[in-house]
Amino acid sequence: MPLADGTAVPLSQWEGRWLVINYWAEWCGPCRDEIPELNELHAERAATGMVVLGVNYDGLVQPKLGEVIGRMDIKFPTLLKDPEPTYGYGRPEQLPVTVLINPAREVHRVLIGPQTASALLAAAAS
């Protein structure tokens, strides 16, 4: 999967881990509010079981995408391509939306509205 930082990562790199796919946009206030929680979750859990991946809702490309990621202080990887076709959960129609993909690569939950790290961990456990 190509990332905004210019690297590419195969999905197999995250084998056995939960994927937290977060759709965000710069103009979305609640999206900006949840970024620190998502940064924290990714920093604490990416190596051990839960990877946060961002998707810019507006489909920005470089260099604009990198500028916005910097302004919003997003620390987790941002995908260049929407993973929705891979998982089939439907393109979000509002923001923010966070999709939980379980370690078996199945859609576990689609969550609408801003999320906290604790809420995402609880949703994964339910």
Q: Which role does the model predict for each range below?
A:
Residues M1, Y57, Q115:
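Hydrophobic pocket-lining residues within nucleotide cofactor-binding pockets
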Residues M1-L11:
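N-terminal "domain-start" segment that seeds a small globular fold
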Residues V9-R32:
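Short active-site neighborhood of thiol/selenol oxidoreductases, capturing the structured segment around
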Residues W14-R17, A47, I74-K75:
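Active-site acidic short loop of glycosyltransferases
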Residues W18, W27, H42-R45, Q115, ...:
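Sec/Tat-exported extracytoplasmic proteins
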Residues V20-I21, V52, T98:
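Hydrophobic beta-strand anchors of alpha/beta hydrolase catalytic cores
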Residues R32-M72, K81-G88:
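Structural microenvironment flanking redox-active thiols in thiol-disulfide oxidoreductases
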Residues E67-K75, L80-A125:
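Thiol/disulfide oxidoreductase modules built on the thioredoxin-like
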